[in-house]
Regions:
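Conserved helix-to-beta-strand junction in the class I
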Residues: 84-90
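Class I (Rossmann-like) S-adenosyl-L-methionine-dependent methyltransferase catalytic domain
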Residues: 1, 5-53, 73-80, 94-144
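Short catalytic micro-motifs in class I SAM-dependent methyltransferases
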Residues: 68-72
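A conserved beta-strand element that flanks and buttresses the S-adenosyl-L-methionine
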Residues: 65
């Protein structure tokens, strides 16, 4: 079973079902527009919900993913969204991508490119942050 937090119109869920139609998938997004206009094939599996308070029991999914979504949060909301993703995952099987940079040039590109992100950090700051809040899932960087 797979959960996509910040699924938008469900494109990734659709791809998972193309790989294996027997996969059990679910997706949430804060955008009513995105959910209303989701791909027909995944509409039964998506709903409007908040990443900071996922409407699923503990350990509900074999894998929970969130691709370039948590950058929309900061402070306590960022922490809550990451720990919620981990809470609904079995054996801490969660995967996220976050906006990151490794040097000043990448930071400038990131700031120019992503005008809506609330949280962008150096890769080392992200690692420290994950450790401090107890996030144990997998992660990868989006670096423009």
């Amino acid at each position: 079973s797979i959960l996509d937090v910040g699924c938008a119109k469900g494109f990734m869920l659709y791809d998972f079902l193309q790989i294996n139609p027997k996969f059990k998938v679910a997706g949430i997004d804060i955008s009513e527009y995105a959910i209303k206009n989701a791909l027909e094939e995944v509409k039964p599996f998506v709903r409007v919900a908040d990443a900071r308070e996922l409407p699923f029991p503990d350990h509900s999914f074999d894998l929970s993913i969130s691709i370039t979504t948590v950058h929309n949060f900061e402070g306590e909301d960022l922490k809550r969204s990451l720990l919620e993703l981990q809470r609904v995952s079995k054996n801490n099987r969660s995967f996220i991508t976050v906006d990151a940079y490794r040097n000043d040039e990448e930071k400038k590109r990131m700031e120019a490119w992503n005008l809506t992100a609330k949280t962008m950090m150096h890769v080392d700051e992200w690692k420290e942050y994950f450790f401090q809040i107890g996030y144990e899932g997998d992660f990868y960087w989006f670096i423009p």
